[in-house]
């Protein structure tokens, strides 16, 4: 029995492979043409926001990339300071020489129920954040859950925006996480990602679990 062939003796699978190769070659050429125009480098202002999971996780992913490359970086946690997390334990135990880690929050606002104390802690965290960002040895600074502090006006968003525009070193990346990012912050950012919530186990009665949420 002979294989099915097209006119000219080319098998259908071979014809599909040739078509695919040509299509991918065109995509590659177009991509390379675009990439050739992208030559600038700068420190990015990155905002991870939205109701979905993964805002802090994405931020820590970039921090771990920095650690892997031996690039000095820092983390300031504005809300989760009272919670023991896997990323905090790992960094403090094994990578403290590359990444500075500061937990200056005392928990979510509904846990503390003390606005004056929350404001004081947020302001303290912001002062530390500014210090770390000004230090040009730090290639990246993650401001974890700062958007929550901004949402409740614990910190003035205008001051944060002004600082990022006027005082952030040119090559320093700053990552700001938390839902409900303020429009003024979104406007000044270079990269904004909104995490969309489609399904969440909490709605099915499943609690936050070690290794997934913390």
Curated annotation (Swiss-Prot):
GO terms for molecular function: ATP binding; corrinoid adenosyltransferase activity. ATP binds at residues 50-56. The keyword Glycosyltransferase does not apply. InterPro entries: CblAdoTrfase_CobA (IPR003724), Co_AT_N_dom (IPR025826), P-loop_NTPase (IPR027417). GO terms for biological process: cobalamin biosynthetic process; porphyrin-containing compound biosynthetic process. Its cofactor is Mn(2+). It is found in: Cytoplasm. The keyword Ligase does not apply. GO terms for cellular component: cytoplasm. Keywords: ATP-binding, Cobalamin biosynthesis, Cytoplasm, Manganese, Nucleotide-binding, Porphyrin biosynthesis, Transferase. Its EC number is 2.5.1.17. Pathway: Cofactor biosynthesis; adenosylcobalamin biosynthesis; adenosylcobalamin from cob(II)yrinate a,c-diamide: step 2/7. It catalyses: 2 cob(II)yrinate a,c diamide + reduced [electron-transfer flavoprotein] + 2 ATP = 2 adenosylcob(III)yrinate a,c-diamide + 2 triphosphate + oxidized [electron-transfer flavoprotein] + 3 H(+); 2 cob(II)alamin + reduced [electron-transfer flavoprotein] + 2 ATP = 2 adenosylcob(III)alamin + 2 triphosphate + oxidized [electron-transfer flavoprotein] + 3 H(+). Required for both de novo synthesis of the corrin ring for the assimilation of exogenous corrinoids. Participates in the adenosylation of a variety of incomplete and complete corrinoids. Belongs to the Cob(I)alamin adenosyltransferase family. Monomer. This is Corrinoid adenosyltransferase.
């Amino acid at each position: 029995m002979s294989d099915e062939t097209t006119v000219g003796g080319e098998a259908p699978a071979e014809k599909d492979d040739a078509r695919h190769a040509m299509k991918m070659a065109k995509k590659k050429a177009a991509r390379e043409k675009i990439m050739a125009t992208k030559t600038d480098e700068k420190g990015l202002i990155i905002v991870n926001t939205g109701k979905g999971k993964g805002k802090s996780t994405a931020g820590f992913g970039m921090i771990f990339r920095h650690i892997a490359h031996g690039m000095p970086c820092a983390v300031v946690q504005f809300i989760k300071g009272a919670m023991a997390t896997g990323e905090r334990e790992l960094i403090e135990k094994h990578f403290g020489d590359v990444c500075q880690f500061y937990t200056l929050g005392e928990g979510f606002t509904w846990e503390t129920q003390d606005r004056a104390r929350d404001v004081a802690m947020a302001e303290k965290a912001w002062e530390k954040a500014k210090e770390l960002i000004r230090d040009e040895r730090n290639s990246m600074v993650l401001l974890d859950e700062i958007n929550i502090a901004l949402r409740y006006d614990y910190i003035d968003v205008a001051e944060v925006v002004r600082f990022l525009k006027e005082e952030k070193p040119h090559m320093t990346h700053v990552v700001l996480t938390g839902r409900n990012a303020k429009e003024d912050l979104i406007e000044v950012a270079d990269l904004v990602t909104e995490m969309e919530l489609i399904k969440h186990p909490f709605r099915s009665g499943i609690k936050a679990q070690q290794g997934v949420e913390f």
